[in-house]
A protein has these predicted regions:
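Glycine-rich beta-alpha loop elements in corrinoid/cobalamin-binding modules
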Residues: 6-7, 34-136
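Proline-centered helix-kink/hinge sites
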Residues: 13, 27-28, 91, 103
């Protein structure tokens, strides 16, 4: 899979019910950190944390790559979003604690799953996609 990637959109969907972050203000910084890293490398980046800002689906549907973070309480929404982005032609990467522990489930909705902390793996994955390396 060799693709020219310019526009990257990172999304953390909002849960429809209570979860670990509902009662305690603990920010999930993975998407913000990855977005900042990729912006510093010259990519056009958007980051949507739905608890803070509504997701602009026009941005998602026009992205070259959509990275979706999933915790267990947001997995259904995350998978629906991943399916929509994939149907629109984006490369879809899933990460977060849920897909780290359930990668086979994540791969049913994404092109790639990044497990664990993704600061280095995500950059390497994007570089490999651009070069078309190692993906058969």
């Amino acid at each position: 899979m060799k693709r020219q990637l310019k526009k990257l959109v990172f999304v953390e969907p909002k849960s429809t019910h209570l979860h670990i972050y509902s009662r305690v203000c603990i920010p999930r910084l993975g998407s913000v950190l990855l977005g900042t890293i990729m912006r510093s490398k010259g990519y056009d980046v958007r980051v949507y944390i739905e608890d803070i800002q509504a997701i602009d689906m026009r941005e998602v549907l026009s992205a070259d790559l959509v990275a979706v973070s999933a915790i267990t309480s947001t997995a259904p929404q995350s998978y629906r979003l991943a399916d929509t982005a994939k149907a629109a032609g984006a490369v879809v990467v899933m990460g977060g604690t849920h897909t780290s522990f359930m990668p086979d489930e994540g791969m049913q909705h994404a092109d790639f799953v990044v497990r664990g902390e993704g600061e280095f793996a995500f950059q390497e994955l994007v570089d490999a996609i651009q070069r078309g390396d190692g993906f058969g």
